[in-house]
Regions:
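Extracytoplasmic metal-acquisition and chelation regions
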Residues: 4-7, 14-331
Length: 331
C-alpha cells in the first residue's frame, strides 16, 4: 500500500510539473482568472465531516466549493486515492480528514501540496483527549493480517460515531472557517451552536433510551466500529472483529462464542453494519437455542454515497435511525 501511494504521488508531481509552464499562458489567453478560484475550496474525506461542514456553513455553502472524496460507497479502510483525489487535496484551502491509519496517504500528499497556506482539521488531533485504542474484547477474533509495526499502538478511527465528538469537531470547523473568512464569523458561530443543540437533544434521547432499557449489551456478528458510541452511554458489546479489522471470515470458535453469548444474555437481536452480507449473523443465529433472533443493522456511515446525500441523508438522520434500531435491540 505504501509503495502504491508513493507511486501515485510521483505521478501527481509529474503532472503538476508539466502543467506549471502552461499555467501563465492559459491565464493570459483567457484574459480573466477562473471564477472558481474565488471560492474557498474545502475537501472532506468522509460523509460525517462533509455534513458537519455543511451545517456550519449554512447559507454560506453556496459560496464555497465543498467536496467529499469518498462519495461512491467506498469504505475508508479500503479507499485507494486516484491522482484526481491527490490533486484535490493538494489544491484545496481547507482539508478535513480523520487522521488515522487509513489516512496515511493524506499525510504524504500534504508534504507535496501546492497550496502552502492550506489549513487542515485532523479529527484525531482535535479529539486527542477522547481517542481510544483499539481493544480486543472476549471472543473477538484476532486480525490475522496484522500490521506493519506490531509494537505500535492502534487507535480506533471511528470517532464520528460519538455525538459528543461531533459537537467538538463542529467547534473546530467553525473556528477554522472564522480564521479563513472573518467577515462571516457570526454566521459560522451561530450555525455551529444551532447544530450543537440538535446534537445535544439527540444525545439526551440516546441517554434516556439506555437508562430505561432492559438490556445493556450489543452483539455484532461483524466488524465493530461503534466503540465511541457504546462508551458514551455505558453499553457493553461483543463482536466478531474489531472496527478496523480486515477479516471477513469468522472462525468456528468465534461463531460458537457469539451464539452462546446470545443465549446466555437472552438477546433478541444480532447486529451487522451497513452493506454486510449477513452470512456471519445468520450462522450465529442458527447456532443459538431459539434460532429466532432478528438481524439489525447499525449504520456506521463509512459508505454513504453522493446519491444518498442527494436523497436527503444527513448525519443526524442516520444517528436518529440508529437510535430507533437500538431501542428495538435493548428492549
Amino acid at each position: 500500500m505504501k509503495k502504491w501511494i508513493t507511486g501515485m504521488l510521483a505521478i501527481f508531481m509529474g503532472v503538476v510539473s508539466l502543467s506549471i509552464p502552461f499555467a501563465g499562458l492559459h491565464t493570459a489567453e483567457a484574459g480573466i482568472k477562473d471564477t472558481s478560484d474565488k471560492k474557498l475550496k474545502i475537501v472532506t474525506t468522509i460523509f460525517p465531516e462533509y455534513d458537519w461542514t455543511r451545517a456550519v456553513l449554512g447559507e454560506r455553502e453556496a459560496d464555497v466549493e465543498l467536496t467529499m472524496l469518498l462519495d461512491n460507497g467506498t469504505d475508508l479502510h479500503s479507499f485507494q486515492p486516484a491522482v484526481k483525489d491527490i490533486m484535490k487535496v493538494s489544491g484545496c484551502d481547507l482539508l478535513i480528514y480523520v487522521g488515522g491509519e487509513s489516512d496515511e496517504w493524506i499525510e504524504d500528499a500534504l508534504k507535496s501540496a501546492q497550496n502552502k497556506d492550506m489549513k487542515t482539521i485532523n479529527l484525531m488531533e482535535v479529539l486527542a483527549d477522547s481517542i481510544k485504542e483499539e481493544e480486543t474484547v472476549e471472543g473477538m477474533q484476532e486480525n490475522e493480517h496484522g500490521h506493519e509495526h506490531e509494537d505500535e499502538k492502534e487507535y480506533d478511527e471511528h470517532v464520528w460515531t460519538s455525538l459528543h465528538n461531533a459537537s467538538t469537531v463542529c467547534d473546530a470547523i467553525a473556528e477554522t472557517l472564522t480564521e479563513m473568512d472573518p467577515e462571516n464569523k457570526d454566521i459560522y458561530q451561530s450555525n455551529a451552536e444551532a447544530y450543537q443543540k440538535k446534537l445535544s437533544a439527540l444525545d439526551a434521547e440516546y441517554q434516556d433510551t439506555v437508562e430505561t432499557a432492559t438490556q445493556n449489551t450489543l452483539l455484532f456478528a461483524d466488524r465493530f466500529p461503534f466503540r465511541y458510541l457504546t462508551d458514551d452511554y455505558g453499553l457493553n458489546y461483543y463482536a466478531a472483529f474489531s472496527g478496523c479489522s480486515a477479516e471477513s471470515e469468522a472462525s468456528f470458535k468465534t461463531i460458537t462464542f457469539l451464539a452462546r453469548k446470545v443465549d446466555e444474555l437472552g438477546l433478541n437481536s444480532v447486529f451487522t453494519i451497513e452493506k454486510s452480507d449477513d452470512r456471519i449473523a445468520q450462522t450465529v443465529i442458527e447456532n443459538t437455542k431459539t434460532k429466532d433472533q432478528n438481524i439489525l443493522v447499525l449504520n456506521s456511515m463509512q459508505s454513504i454515497t453522493a446519491q444518498e446525500i442527494t436523497d436527503g441523508t444527513t448525519y443526524l438522520s442516520v444517528m436518529e435511525e440508529n437510535l430507533k434500531v437500538l431501542k428495538e435491540a435493548l428492549n
